[in-house]
Structures are given as C-alpha cells and as structure tokens.
Amino acid sequence: MKREPIFAFAQGSESREVVRKLYIGIAPVFVLAVNPNKEETEKLYNTELDEAPNYLSETEVGPEGNKSKVSQARIDFVVKSDPEKCNGIEMLTKVTFFLNKAYRYNKDNTKVEVINKYGETTWLPVGAAKGTEPIPDNMKWYDTSDMRPAYIGEAELTDFIKKYLNIPNKSFTNPKTKEVKFIPNLADAEARLDKIDNYFKGDFTELKNIIKLQPNNRVKGMFGVRTTDDNKQYQAVYTQKFLKLNVTDYSKLDEEMQNRKAAGAYPTTEFSIEPLHEYNVAATDFNSPENGPLGAGSAPTSTPWDAWSGNK
C-alpha cells in the first residue's frame, strides 16, 4: 500500500513583497513618545524586539588631527502625522536629535555657542561666555540671563521643543514702528533643558515630562526621502528648523533648507514644502535599522557648516 507523504508543516500563507510607504512635504505631527523603552516601542510599532533600544553611544568631536571621544545621547521623538490635516495620512516616524557631551566652538576655538534661559542661542568670545571679559558692544542685544555654554545639538533640540509647546519669544518687533516690545510675562518664554547631564546616563525623565505638558499639541516639520548610494530610500526629516502649528508661510523654511543644501548638506535627500503626500518609490530594504523602531546606530555624517567642538 502506497502511503501519502506526511508533512510536519502548516500550510503557511502567500508571500508578498512588503513595501513601506514614504512621505514628503510639510506635516503637523503629534509627539507620541520620546526614547521609548522596549515595551513602549513594541506597542507603538506593533512589533516585537529582541532587545531594548539603546540611546547611548560615543562619538568623536574636534578638528582633524585633534579629535576626542565624548558621550552621545540619541533623542528619538516618535511622531505621527495628524490625519485630519494630512488628507488622511497617518505617517508614523521619528524625529531624531543627537546630543554630544561637549560644547560647540568655532574652528579656532575663540568663540563658543551659548544658550540663555529663554532657549535663545548665539556665539560669544570664550572669555565673555566665562565672565572673565565684557560682552562685546555688538552683542549687547543678547540677553545673558542664566547663560551657559550649549551642548552640541542642544540648540536644535530646544527649538523643536519650543515649537511643540508653542512657547512665545520673549520679545517681538512692531512691523509698523519697528519698536521692540516684550511680552507681559517673561516667564512664559522660558525654555531651557536643565538636566542634560542625566541624558548621558540614560535618564530621559526631563524630556518625558516635557512632552506631557501639552499632549495634544502638534508641531510642523518638513519631511523628505533620503536615497543611499545603493539606491535604497528612507524616511527623513529636516531637523534644523520646525514650525509652530499656526504658521502657514513656509518660504523662510524652504530658503534655509535650500541654502544648507547649496552648502553641501542633505546631498541625497529630497524635501518639499507642499502638503504631506506619498512619495512614489520602488521597494527597499526595511530591515535596515534606520527604518526600524530601534533607529540608526550612529549619528548622521557631518556637514560643511558644523563647527568644531571641544570637550566639556
């Protein structure tokens, strides 16, 4: 009697090529989480992880020939586009910043970037920043309240948070009289991170508490698509500038982005100031860590305008 072969396999299912949609354009986004742990990440992305996300690493800073290693913290904001404002599009992605435990200096180390309690940044001579010499006359406009040197990456991170929380500038210029006016309550304009040292120890409590202040807020970002040398494409975001929700004129954002691209930044990334829409591309490898919930393993490459940085 001929026996039918016995298979110890279930029937399975039809195989299909997985193509993840990529999007390009301006979009208001909700912030769902910041540096989520393993359980939170699995819930957000409806997936299972073999290991917990690691947000700490090291990187090199400084000019060629005089580089040094410093601690680095990756800050991942998991964001989702507002479908009511994006023609039904629900884009789930990340806005990533890298903070280095080093201060940001110019090329000859004569100036350092500083930040005040209002989250305003500028460049000052090192002596002026330390308080060992007076502020130059041409910099007297800068409010030095609780001023301190800024970490590399802090300015961009602070700007994102200010735009997300809809924090006002402490002053504005009357368009008719050109007179500078201050808001009634300057405390409303305060915006500075005070526990950054904790980030390099893996403690992101300050950031997690910040996004809870206005959980229903949205911030506008410019999203794009980056193409690698092997023709793979990934979701990208312009992290140098974000906009408050009520802003509808994107010309300055576009001008800034175009100037940076002309200087050599984002050489393989395409951006648009049109409303968010699907970017038609071929299938790519979405097993790459850059498109996964754990994120990229290292910081993005440097750009021509990046200032040399010194250790803290």
PLM region spans:
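Short beta-rich binding modules
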Residues: 1-312
